[in-house]
Design a protein with these regions (language model features):
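Conserved, well-structured core segments that form or line functional sites
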Residues: 135-136
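Extended, subdomain-level signal for the structured scaffold at the beginning of enzyme domains
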Residues: 1-131, 143-231
């Protein structure tokens, strides 16, 4: 059976440039759309987080005024149904990548608080990439890629095509001002061949085993590309 590891941020905040706190976490739709699609495809899905900490869903991602009544209700229903799994993630440091076919990272601002600098996240990604396993991330999830460094301190994803939430979308969302750093800009500076589509429209980039989606709207299309790659 195909076995997928979804790595969830353990952060419940994003520390801003001035030290103020922006309450955050995992963007619910990005987790739900990916997890639901993988389970429906018949894959076994494990969840992990730094320290095995129970992930926090960004409250904005469950706000009907933000995402719409239907989406908010679907998110809450799925999260409630899967509460036991979500509340008992594996400890990321204890993950053996040999047992997985794909490593997947949803976004929300959580990853730009913790996963981007988490050494265990980096190890998991390095091991997965060396074994040519599928690596997928969406929205702010590609921040996790920044944690990966090879034995020479180099970023193994330099020169690879990828996408993430664009700087323009960060500005439109209202979180670019006072941000300690912007994800798309940072990925470019690290050497990524960054691509993006229209704001808030689905856009997925495939470069070998690296699959990335731009925004929440890209979650289901990304899941479909991951599933196709694993068939």
């Amino acid at each position: 059976m195909t076995h997928i590891l979804i790595v969830l941020s353990a952060a419940d905040k994003w520390t801003r440039a001035d030290g103020s706190i922006y309450e955050s976490g995992v963007w619910a739709q990005e987790f739900v759309d990916l997890d639901e699609a993988f389970v429906r495809a018949g894959f076994k899905v494990d969840l992990a987080s730094p320290g095995g900490i129970v992930p926090t869903m960004d409250k904005r991602s469950l706000d009907p005024n933000m995402v719409g009544e239907n989406v908010a209700e679907r998110m809450r229903t799925y999260l409630d149904k899967n509460a036991e799994r979500i509340e008992n993630p594996l400890v990321l440091a204890e993950v053996d990548t040999a047992g997985y076919d794909a490593i997947v990272v949803p976004g929300g601002h959580g990853p730009v608080e913790d996963l981007y600098k988490d050494p265990d996240m980096g190890r998991v990604l390095i091991e997965a990439d060396k074994a040519d396993k599928v690596i997928a991330a969406v929205c702010h999830g590609p921040a996790a890629l920044l944690a990966a460094r090879d034995e020479h301190g180099r970023w193994p994803f330099a020169g690879r095509k990828m996408t993430s939430l664009s700087d323009e979308e960060e500005i439109e969302f209202g979180t670019a001002e006072n941000a300690p750093w912007l994800l798309a800009d940072t990925l470019r500076k690290q050497g990524a061949l960054f691509e993006q589509g229209p704001n808030w429209h689905a856009y997925v980039v495939k470069d070998g085993n690296l699959l990335t989606g731009q925004n929440p709207q890209s979650s289901t299309p990304l899941a479909e590309v991951v599933i196709a790659a694993l068939r």
